[in-house]
Amino acid sequence: MFVKKGDKVRVIAGKDKGTEAVVLKALPKVNKVVVEGVAIIKKHQKPSTENPQGAIVEKEAPIHASNVQVLDKNGVAGRVGYKVVDGKKVRYNKKSGEVLD
């Protein structure tokens, strides 16, 4: 998976298109990512001992990894490629050529 936790990304599809935010969680088995402030859903929680009233909680839902582009340090969005630098496999931005890792 080309996106990692902590990457700054731009959403390129969906209702939050154009939003730039940080990846909170990567889910490689289902090829999805949770992005801060994107795809907010309302989750209804049952009453419990900690929360006797119950509540409606807003949280981020996962979106497909193909709907985001990774930004480099200069804010250029592009596809991610892999190359070997000094014996290590690193990710780089194909548009700007800048190493991401």
UniProtKB/Swiss-Prot annotation:
PROSITE patterns associated with the record: RIBOSOMAL_L24
UniProtKB keywords: Ribonucleoprotein, Ribosomal protein, RNA-binding, rRNA-binding
GO MF: rRNA binding; structural constituent of ribosome
InterPro entries in UniProt: KOW, Rib_uL2_dom2, Ribosomal_uL24, Ribosomal_uL24_CS, Ribosomal_uL24_KOW, Translation_prot_SH3-like_sf
GO cellular component terms given for this protein: ribonucleoprotein complex; ribosome
Domain of life: Bacteria
Signal sequence region: none
One GO BP: translation
Function: One of two assembly initiator proteins, it binds directly to the 5'-end of the 23S rRNA, where it nucleates assembly of the 50S subunit. One of the proteins that surrounds the polypeptide exit tunnel on the outside of the subunit.
Quaternary context: Part of the 50S ribosomal subunit.
Record-stated family: Belongs to the universal ribosomal protein uL24 family.
The protein, known as: Large ribosomal subunit protein uL24
Underlying gene: rplX
